[in-house]
């Protein structure tokens, strides 16, 4: 907000939920929605640490450079360019910078509960060209409970991923009644993929096991290596007592087998020509001596319905002894023939030199559910930003191109 004010724009902090930046005091025609919050730093950074930005060969490394502070800055630069170059506008553009995109959208919901939608909305929180389809979400919570256990050997605790929309890079479990030698023998016989590693350490009455993998965005689970499902796979291979926790672990391995990224085992796998296939990441699980709670993150295509997604998953989980809570958040779809999308396409083609087209993603942005809203940039096609992972980066030249594209969009939508 301070930078926007320094650049001669009108900026305000709206009760800590969002920052709003206006180009003028006329009726608002265009909203640009970005966010300033970031995910956890994670591990595995090699170029720099997560919160020490570093420019190397035209790439700016650091957490949030691509998701989404860099793109927000590109939009702000576009607003400054329109102002500094003296273009006459008949309408206003408002940049809305949120603070809760990664953990629930409470910020943007708060804003639109109090302010009207704009006739046109874009979010620079994804890729170019135009994302006109954002898949739906089915992210239920399931639970099971049982009396205090005493049987040995058993799993007495399990801690999986910390975030619903992130493939877990770490998972830990305590196993009572087994030795490190027994567990290491099971690891050797398991044949797990090379990207997964296990460490075993002595603990009171047993061992502590940690699985390490690679995090990824929950909408693209195939790009990560799920430590949570890898650890469950190992636990199910151990000589555990026949008790409730063991039965739960075996059921979880059956319902969420390591490497199943499409919900095949839950009976949810499906796809359509416009939006592609369903994705699923089993991302959160806690287990104690008396119960467990888990969540998974599935992104549903346009063809996904209660009958083809929720009901099969509920039936499978309930048959395994779990209670289930959760509903489908429907997909977001703006027809490719919408005139606003044609305006965006022209601006993109003019400055990128590439042909525009519409695409579907599993990720969700602030425009999800906003009438006519689409995600538009700021990453160019083919660029690997490693968002949510180590060595997140943004291409500075592409960011400047994005700023030019957004400048043109502002002129086309809000100009005289």
Regions found by a protein language model. Give the residues of each.
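Short coil/turn connectors at secondary-structure junctions
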Residues: 26-31, 49, 56-57, 89-93, ...
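Short beta-strand
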Residues: 10-14, 199-202, 282, 358-359
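Acidic/histidine-rich catalytic neighborhood of metal-dependent amide-processing enzymes
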Residues: 68-147, 180, 184, 188, ...
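Active-site metal-coordination/substrate-binding segment of hydrolases
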Residues: 29-97, 103, 389-401
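A non-catalytic alpha/beta surface segment that caps or lines the substrate-entry region
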Residues: 1-28, 52-53
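Acidic-enriched catalytic cores of C-N bond-cleaving enzymes acting on peptides and small amides
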Residues: 132-159, 164-214, 218-280, 306-321
């Amino acid at each position: 907000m301070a930078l926007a004010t320094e650049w001669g724009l009108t900026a305000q902090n709206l009760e800590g939920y969002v920052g709003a930046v206006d180009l003028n005091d006329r009726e608002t025609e265009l909203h640009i929605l970005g966010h300033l919050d970031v995910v956890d730093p994670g591990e595995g950074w090699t170029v720099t640490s997560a919160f020490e930005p570093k420019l190397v060969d035209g790439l700016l490394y650091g957490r949030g450079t691509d998701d989404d502070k860099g793109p927000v800055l590109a939009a702000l630069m576009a607003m400054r360019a329109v102002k500094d170059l003296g273009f006459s506008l008949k309408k206003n553009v408002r940049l809305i910078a949120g603070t809760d995109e990664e953990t629930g959208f409470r910020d943007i919901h708060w804003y639109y509960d109090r302010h009207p939608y704009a006739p046109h909305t874009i979010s620079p929180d994804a890729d170019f060209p135009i994302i006109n389809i954002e898949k739906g979400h089915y992210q239920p919570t399931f639970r099971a409970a049982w009396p205090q256990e005493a049987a040995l050997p058993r799993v007495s605790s399990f801690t999986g991923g910390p975030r619903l929309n992130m493939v877990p890079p770490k998972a830990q479990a305590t196993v009572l009644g087994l030795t490190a030698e027994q567990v290491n023998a099971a690891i050797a016989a398991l044949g797990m993929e090379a990207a997964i590693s296990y460490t075993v350490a002595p603990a009171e009455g047993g061992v502590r096991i940690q699985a390490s993998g690679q995090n990824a965005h929950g909408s693209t689970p195939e790009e990560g290596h799920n430590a949570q499902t890898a650890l469950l796979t190992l636990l199910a291979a151990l000589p555990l007592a026949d008790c409730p926790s063991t039965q739960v672990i075996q059921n979880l391995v059956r319902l969420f087998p390591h490497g199943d990224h499409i919900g095949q085992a839950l009976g949810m796998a499906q796809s359509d020509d416009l939006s592609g296939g369903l994705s699923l990441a089993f991302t959160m699980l806690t287990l104690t001596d008396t119960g467990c709670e888990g969540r998974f993150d599935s992104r549903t295509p346009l063809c996904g319905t209660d009958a083809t997604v929720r009901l099969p998953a509920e039936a499978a989980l309930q048959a395994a002894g779990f209670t289930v809570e959760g509903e489908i958040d429907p997909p977001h779809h703006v027809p490719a023939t919408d005139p606003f999308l044609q305006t965006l396409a022209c601006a993109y083609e003019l400055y990128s030199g590439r042909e525009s087209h519409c695409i579907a993603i599993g990720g969700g942005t602030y425009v999800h559910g906003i009438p006519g809203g689409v995600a538009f940039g700021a990453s160019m096609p083919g660029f690997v930003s490693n968002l949510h992972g180590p060595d997140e980066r943004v291409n500075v030249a592409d960011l400047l191109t994005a700023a030019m594209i957004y400048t043109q969009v502002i002129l086309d939508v809000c100009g005289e």
